[in-house]
């Protein structure tokens, strides 16, 4: 299968190109923290020559508790995103949860993300497709890798071919996720770029009284395993103080470890893509 190249600004995203980092923070906690996080990412990716797209959510609409922090909301979130783009000249990815959010978000950011829990919602898919933006499709925890073709078809038939696929783990019993490494090659067979959300794959959903737990201590091992599959990109969330993060702190990479972590991911990506392809059919 010929591998498609999806353009995000001036960045080529493809399974046979050097990996692209989609990284930042889980949710916008404040303007100042967002600026600090993106500055750290820009410094690290520039030093390592890694193409970079900033990630953050303006609203976490699927929290375990109604009392949990959700974010600044659409209007303030887009204002912060505009400031980040103007200051750092980086593309941005963020998620939408309702059809009405797709158009205004697509006017500001470069990639709009279809959340895993909502990946089969046809009205949301159609609204996102109609923006003509690049779409990052999170694979739902309850879907098999080969079922992503149905979501791709929905987007295609709604007029959008600018698609990236994202692995984020699969349900393994209660309160646990696992990543099936065979799923990467299955999704790559579509020709679309595949990226790996290592952060959310470390989640233990519902494992705490009112929020998800996580396994941050294993982020390097899981990241290297994913990058060994020769994929288009890595999706990563970091935090200056994970223990006090307002969402998914147990999964977040400590911000001060970012450059060292990315250095290892880049080495694995380069190694994986240096091998000759062996046809075992």
From Swiss-Prot:
Q: Which GO terms describe its molecular function?
A: 3-deoxy-8-phosphooctulonate synthase activity
The UniProt catalytic activity note for this protein reads:
D-arabinose 5-phosphate + phosphoenolpyruvate + H2O = 3-deoxy-alpha-D-manno-2-octulosonate-8-phosphate + phosphate
EC number(s) of the enzyme?
A: 2.5.1.55
Question: GO annotations under biological process?
Answer: keto-3-deoxy-D-manno-octulosonic acid biosynthetic process
Q: In which pathway does it act?
A: Carbohydrate biosynthesis; 3-deoxy-D-manno-octulosonate biosynthesis; 3-deoxy-D-manno-octulosonate from D-ribulose 5-phosphate: step 2/3; Bacterial outer membrane biogenesis; lipopolysaccharide biosynthesis
Q: Where found?
A: Cytoplasm
Q: Alphabetically list the UniProt keywords.
A: Cytoplasm, Lipopolysaccharide biosynthesis, Transferase
Belongs to which family? Belongs to the KdsA family.
What protein does this entry describe? 2-dehydro-3-deoxyphosphooctonate aldolase
Organism of provenance:
Psychromonas ingrahamii (strain DSM 17664 / CCUG 51855 / 37)
The major lineage groups are:
Bacteria, Pseudomonadati, Pseudomonadota, Gammaproteobacteria, Alteromonadales
